[in-house]
UniProtKB/Swiss-Prot annotation:
SUPFAM superfamilies: Ribulose-phoshate binding barrel. The keyword Protease does not apply. NCBIfam families: 1-(5-phosphoribosyl)-5-[(5-phosphoribosylamino)methylideneamino]imidazole-4-carboxamide isomerase (TIGR00007). This is 1-(5-phosphoribosyl)-5-[(5-phosphoribosylamino)methylideneamino] imidazole-4-carboxamide isomerase. It comes from Syntrophotalea carbinolica (strain DSM 2380 / NBRC 103641 / GraBd1) (Pelobacter carbinolicus).
Amino acid sequence: MIVIPAIDLKEGRCVRLEQGLMEKDTVYNDNPGAQARSWQEQGGELLHIVDLDGAFAGVPRNRDAIRAIAEAVSIPTELGGGIRDLPTIEAYLELGIDRVILGTVAKENPELVREACRLFPGRIVVGIDARDGLVAVRGWADVTEKLATELAKEMEGFGVEAIIYTDIARDGMMGGPNLEATRALAESISVPVIASGGVSCLEDIARLMTIEDSGVTGVITGKALYTGSLDLREAVALTKGKA
């Protein structure tokens, strides 16, 4: 299992939201490139970037900050938020992003995901955000009636590289990850699942490691790293058996 530091971008700055609410944001760094370098230096093996403005607007909004991050690090990067067409996917891959995360479009235009997987094999990840097991879309603003496990199986059939599963009620609240829901999703498919939302401390990482055999290959953490309740070096050491 790998620990994946998150950089959420709003108006060109690194922020964290509580439960996906744009008005409940805390700014942690005005320099996204410097923040990315810091996570790499502390042992991060993959960077998770979210264009929050893009997620809510449905179009890219933080291209300069994203370029700065891609140029600042040598580790792989993945990016989501407002990516809803093939030209945007291609533009971000050409910008230096290693893999693109599709969220809302996976539910609303699944054929685009199928085509993206065909054109860019190994570089398409689907983010499934859920509340009470139901898929949420459009920056978490709308909760649908589709089960997260059902959508995950569809995406697996398209050939996505991985599924990022976020429990919205846990995200940014530091209440611990939803192990049961994450395990259930991972066991329903054969593609790797990355857990997201709620990690607050080293113990939460240890708990997630107990469901690694279900197919949970990584964990994304943001707020816990920024507030200091989780140390990235310690988390990486734990997952590598060196803690």
